[in-house]
Amino acid sequence: MAVKKKFPYRAAVVACNGGCRSAEGEAGCADGCIGCKACIDKCKFGAISINEYGVAEVDEEKCIGCGACAKVCPQKVIHVHECANYIVVKCSNKKKGAEAKKQCNVSCIGCGICEKTCTAGAIKVKDNCAVIEESICLSCGMLSLIHISEPTRLRRISY
């Protein structure tokens, strides 16, 4: 059952887009969601499921923003955010540039373009990953590039 909410409201978000799911025998992102389902077991509202990329996904209609899932996440990739701000960084990778891309094809690479472009000063790059200060963000949409595209599976190609 969906919870009727007044806008703005709080809900959990998983800071991983799923590109870290590696092919068998290859190393994936050490900072992303591992699909352990601890968050699912903890959520009393059935608001979390594992998506087709093996990553936890929150249904904002069901989530009440209690933060129970965030407390049990072993990777610390779940946090509660203000849903008035629709811009979120769905990445927790701490590697920089090519090393990050090697682990995850949709990783934030810590280049700082978003930080330089944000006129409100709401975005900072910390540990090679963009972080949005929601209390400052204007949700202007200028940096929709932060909403990373769908991941593709990594696979080893042999010739």
Regions found by a protein language model. Give the residues of each.
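Positively charged, low-complexity/disordered segments
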Residues: 152-153, 157-159
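Conserved small/polar residues in nucleotide/adenosyl-binding loops
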Residues: 146-152
